[in-house]
UniProtKB/Swiss-Prot annotation:
One of its GO terms (cellular component) is nucleus. One of its GO terms (biological process) is DNA-templated transcription. It comes from the Eukaryota. Azasperpyranones display potential anti-cancer activities. Azasperpyranones A, C, D, and F exhibit potent growth-inhibitory activity against the A549, HepG2, HCT-116, and HL-60 cell lines, with IC(50) values of 2.39-14.42 mm, respectively. Moreover, azasperpyranone D significantly inhibits HCT-116 xenograft tumor growth in BALB/c-nu mice. In addition, azasperpyranones A and C can bind with four kinds of therapeutic targets for cancer, eEF2K, FGFR, survivin, and TNF-a. This is Transcription factor ATEG_07666. Specific transcriptional regulator for the azasperpyranone A biosynthesis cluster B. Pfam families: Fungal_trans (PF04082), Zn_clus (PF00172).
Amino acid sequence: MSCPAARKGRQQPGFACEECRRRKARCDRVRPKCGFCTENGMQCVIVEKRQQRGPIKGQLNSMQSQLELPAGIPPVLDDFDIQASGLSEHDMSLVAATSVGTSTEASLILPAALDKLELPASSEAAAAGLPGWPEWLDWQDMNNSSLILPELTASTLTDPLSLDSLNGSPPTMVDSSSKIQMTDLIRAELDQLYFDRVHAFCPIIHRRRYFASLAQDNHTTAQLCLQSAMRALAAAMSANSSHLSEQFYSEARSLLDTHSQTPATPRDKIPLEHIQAWLLLSHYELLRIGVHQAMLTAGRAFRLVQMARLCEIDAPGGDLQLSPVASSSSSISTNTDSSESFVDAEEGRRTFWKKWHVFLHADTMQNSLTRLLPIQVSTRLPAPEANFQNNQPTRTSFLADAMAQTGPSTLSPFAECIIMATLHGRCMTHRRLYATEFEAGTRDFCIRQGWLATAVERRVQMLVPSPAVDSDPMLLFTHMLAYRATVHLSITVQQASWRTVDQQVLAAAYQQRAAQAASEIVRLAKAVPYLSPFKTHPFLPDTLACAATFLSTQTATDGGGDDIQHLLRVLGELQDTHSLARDYLQTLKLQVQGNRQDGWY
């Protein structure tokens, strides 16, 4: 029995021409010109690729009714991927319980269920009266982790104050760092990280007292400012927590700005934590943002230090009125011998000297004359770290007495750094003063030049090399700063117009000292990689760049090019954590490249 013949398809293969489609006539689909167009002498236009047909009749109305009904939300939530959304099961239960009742919540479509709804294109939706995608929503950049819906968090659903900010505000496309949910464990880790890395070059916080304040139930605004500033700086000095630094910085900055705008009465006293927070934020900005913003922020701290009169903590007959700075736990009192009062006064001293230290380096980088050096300072130098942290009162020298000291030094690394920074600042002032106002080479110039050279040389000899230099960022920076002062004195001498043979011999001697000092900076720079970039002093790149600039401007010497390349490598290792290193590295590379073209090395 033979099989029946296959039925011929009713529709011929291919597409009908546009003229037959318009006339609703049967097209024979002959190519290149169908029979109807041939008989009527018309142009036969055939479109091979056509857009897909629109929704079937009633589909748009059905979808629109589903969007308007609250009952359409629960099925979407059932299919939503909780793991990919980043929301906990508790948060999702809150969403399901509170998302029924308003049209705004009912129209919230989660990304994981959008493919199932098959929404029409924007033009078709507009024709149907449906709202299209907002302009701020880029579908190609949207994923379950980067799209943050503020309505779908437990904190916003339970906090009535946060609900007001949701009206009319679109979801925010942000990175994960600005929306990290801080836990007590994260804060504890950053607090510990601060004392492990930051405190070494910014020793102004008493460790035991700080952790005791954290255990309190109520914190003042100044304490919250200090906590956020410390954690921001600690996160900036960590690879694992670096993404948290911007969030803590913004929080601290907002708290400080709000606190600064609060009207104060004459009886109010400046919280010491407020000044410390501004100083720490200036260090953060120096590491992350840039020197100009850091100096603007440091200026806020400078003015607060002057208002609090921290330079008069140890003035003769000093009392509470002479130091109107208030700590959160107790007020500074210079007349009692209790250990707590010593810690109060010592924190005030360290805050003042840190401000002094930052000011001197800011003055150096901004190339301006130092005006605060001649002022009378009635605050003693910082006590040794062990005495400070263990509440053991001790009496230290004033700055002027310590600079005149000739015997072995018994001061703390922080105090030694302050003395050397002061000498370095005076060398810079001496250089600029005689370059702008007086003639270099005069008698006054020679006297001051000789005094500074002797003072720096004596201080270098007092800084006996020790194994701690390679592991202490403050000591390492102090040694480099001493050699940098020698380099600046040599540069100052080169600007003088020497007339006698003795003066020219003296200038050559200064040049030789500067070359040796630059070599010592290169030697000390070899310890920076072992110290770790996360513990390196924020102002260290400035000293490295000074040595590299001096070496690059000298004539070719044995190993001079290798020393410069080593300094550039160290700056390259610091550029990820120190903005100064990034800025100087680009400038020095161009300078070195130009010197190579000149055939120096």
